[in-house]
């Protein structure tokens, strides 16, 4: 006979179990292991952005005023990118550029790299939070998969594109008017609106908006008249077993309108997920192409004919001339460190301008 000394209990918890309970079970607001990445990164990204837009100038990097302290408002304030001369330096506070001097670090554009990287990891942390919580309550991870699309766009625009160019300088600054300037830059230097990946992105976003509006209206139109609540939001029990709206009625309605309709809710909702996520992913892939200076569609035959025949012009050739104008007028003021001076005779002129 074997005699065991001591007792074994399944209730004994390791330090990892205690930490897991503290992060995931013992609180009203879920933190989770993903929160160890999400919350610090989100805090630092937002804190850096508010600090930069409130106090920090862009005079030393772009020759611009960019803070509330200098007279900007919410639409014109920004955390601007570092100077072009700093290339792809991480601009660490303790690095060789700032050498631990916080004021100098801000003047050099250190807040931009700080916000960009903490923002990227904060978004990744939020996606992991959705994965973790879905696994905890035994849901499928489609929310997290969908959120990968805006992450792909953020990473491609703010990190991969400038990595393919000469420095962080050519990334968007974090501000409303600054993003508008970046969009004009993308159009003038990359003809972005004629890029097929941009077209797919626009189709995805606008198509998703259309699907969302149609779906919401259809559900409202086909609600069962049930319950004694004062309004739609109180008329149904959230734990009810029966349907809230009539899928059959909705199917018959759209079959009459379009001739075709979704036959079941699974395909309908998957399509509503697929359209915007695919559109954003395609747009992100297109921006990666721009990082490598890949070109959009070029209709050279139209350009040659327009150059030879002053009476021939298409919307494409007009846009090409406008892009030349953006490049010529924007480069000099957008990159003052290059000391670009364009003589009058090389500035674009033509039927479009």
Curated annotation (Swiss-Prot):
The keyword tRNA-binding does not apply. Chlorophyll a PD2 binds at residue 198. The D1/D2 heterodimer binds P680, chlorophylls that are the primary electron donor of PSII, and subsequent electron acceptors. It shares a non-heme iron and each subunit binds pheophytin, quinone, additional chlorophylls, carotenoids and lipids. There is also a Cl(-1) ion associated with D1 and D2, which is required for oxygen evolution. The PSII complex binds additional chlorophylls, carotenoids and specific lipids. The chain crosses the membrane at residues 41-61, 125-141, 153-166, 208-228, 279-295. The modification N-acetylthreonine is found at residue 2. InterPro entries: D1/D2 (IPR055266), Photo_II_D1/D2_sf (IPR036854), Photo_RC_L/M (IPR000484), Photo_RC_L/M_CS (IPR055265), PSII_PsbD/D2 (IPR005868). CDD domains: Photosystem-II_D2. One of its GO terms (molecular function) is chlorophyll binding. It catalyses: 2 a plastoquinone + 4 hnu + 2 H2O = 2 a plastoquinol + O2. The modification Phosphothreonine is found at residue 2. Chlorophyll a ChlzD2 binds at residue 118. Belongs to the reaction center PufL/M/PsbA/D family. HAMAP family: PSII_PsbD_D2 (MF_01383). This is Photosystem II D2 protein. It comes from Welwitschia mirabilis. The lineage of its organism: Eukaryota, Viridiplantae, Streptophyta, Embryophyta, Tracheophyta. The gene is psbD.
């Amino acid at each position: 006979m074997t005699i065991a000394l001591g007792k074994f209990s399944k209730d004994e918890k390791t330090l990892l179990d205690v930490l897991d309970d503290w992060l995931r079970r013992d609180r009203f607001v879920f933190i989770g292991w993903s929160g160890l990445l999400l919350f610090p990164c989100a805090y630092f990204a937002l804190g850096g952005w508010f600090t930069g837009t409130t106090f920090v100038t862009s005079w030393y990097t772009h020759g611009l005023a960019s803070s509330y302290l200098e007279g900007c408002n919410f639409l014109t304030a920004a955390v601007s990118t570092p100077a072009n001369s700093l290339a792809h330096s991480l601009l660490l506070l303790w690095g060789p550029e700032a050498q631990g001097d916080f004021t100098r670090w801000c003047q050099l554009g250190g807040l931009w790299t700080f916000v960009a990287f903490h923002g990227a990891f904060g978004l990744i942390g939020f996606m992991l939070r959705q994965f973790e919580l879905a696994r905890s309550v035994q849901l499928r991870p489609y929310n997290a998969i969908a959120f990968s699309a805006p992450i792909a766009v953020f990473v491609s625009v703010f990190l991969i594109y400038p990595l393919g160019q000469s420095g962080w300088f050519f990334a968007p600054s974090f501000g409303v008017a600054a993003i508008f300037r970046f969009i004009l830059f993308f159009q003038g230097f990359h003809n972005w609106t004629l890029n097929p990946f941009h077209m797919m992105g626009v189709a995805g976003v606008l198509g998703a908006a259309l699907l969302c509006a149609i779906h919401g209206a259809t559900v409202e139109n086909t609600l069962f008249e049930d319950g004694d609540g004062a309004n739609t939001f109180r008329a149904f029990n959230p734990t009810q077993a029966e349907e809230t709206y009539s899928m059959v009625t909705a199917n018959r309605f759209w079959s009459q309108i379009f001739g075709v309709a979704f036959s079941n809710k699974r395909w309908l909702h998957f399509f509503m997920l697929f359209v915007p996520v695919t559109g954003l992913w395609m747009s992100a892939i297109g921006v990666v192409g721009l990082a490598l200076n890949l070109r959009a569609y070029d209709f050279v035959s139209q350009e040659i004919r327009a150059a030879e025949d002053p009476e021939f012009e298409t919307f494409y050739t007009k846009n090409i001339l406008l892009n030349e104008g953006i490049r010529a007028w924007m480069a000099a003021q957008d990159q003052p460190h290059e000391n670009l001076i364009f003589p009058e005779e090389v500035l674009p002129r033509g039927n479009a301008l």
